[in-house]
Amino acid sequence: MKAIVCLCHGYGDTCTFFLDGIARNIAAAGYGVFALDYPGFGLSEGLHGYIPSFDTLVDDVAETFAKVKGNPDYRGIPSFLFGQSMGGAVALKIHFKQPDEWNGAILVAPMCKISDDVVPAWPVQQVLIFLAKLLPKEKLVPQKDLAELAFKEEEKREQTSYNVIAYKDKPRLRTALEMLRTTQEIESRLEEVSLPIIILHGDADLVTDPAVSKDLYEKAKTSDKTLRLYKDAYHSILEGEPDEAIFQVLDDITSWLDQHSAKEV
């Protein structure tokens, strides 16, 4: 085993559907891959799609990954975070909590800022903030069709309907506010990113803002940083693009892992 890769899934995914295929590809390249469904997502316990505290969610994920890394069989093996979309925010928050405990991070269309095309207008946000105090679990946040925005290939977009355990309803009020608060925090802390990173983002992404991925690349204090922007690619660069484009992204990821795992041996 070359290294451990700990996967953090996105808001509209779980670790048992699209992410499973990504994990198998990375594992086939010689890596031990580990993932979990967040509380309230996938097969985990909790109210479906409800994030009462993003910080608590991050703590739960970090605790699980710490148990993996603490296994005596994996002692001395490099470990990497992999975060896709909202999972990119989870990975960055874990890094902020544990700045010296990971050998690098792979950030795929990371949720450093939710695109203005998806976020409700400012007056609507103020109403939702007020309502969230009274009705935090209610599904009242207006939302565009994320599959339409995220998947370029229609045939692959249609596959999202088979991910029956993924959350597909309107966001719950508290969940939406926690995600917005988290992105605001991350956007203000880009300079603190100190571990080796590769950022991969479609330049036509209308879900998470590729401009902030550029900011992350420019502002992160690590000198070991790579940015890959894919021309005309949408949000789901590992699931919703033409096959040859997906293979290119996967190759970029495994090549980066190979280079950085070799450095740690």
Locations of regions flagged by a protein language model:
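The serine-hydrolase catalytic nucleophile loop
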Residues: 11-23
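Catalytic active-site module of serine/aspartate enzymes centered on a nucleophile-bearing elbow/loop
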Residues: 231-265
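Alpha/beta-hydrolase-fold enzymes
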Residues: 84-171
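Alpha/beta-hydrolase fold nucleophile elbow
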Residues: 72-85
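Short beta-strand/loop motif that positions the catalytic acidic residue
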Residues: 193, 199-201, 205
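Alpha/beta-hydrolase active-site loop
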Residues: 51-70
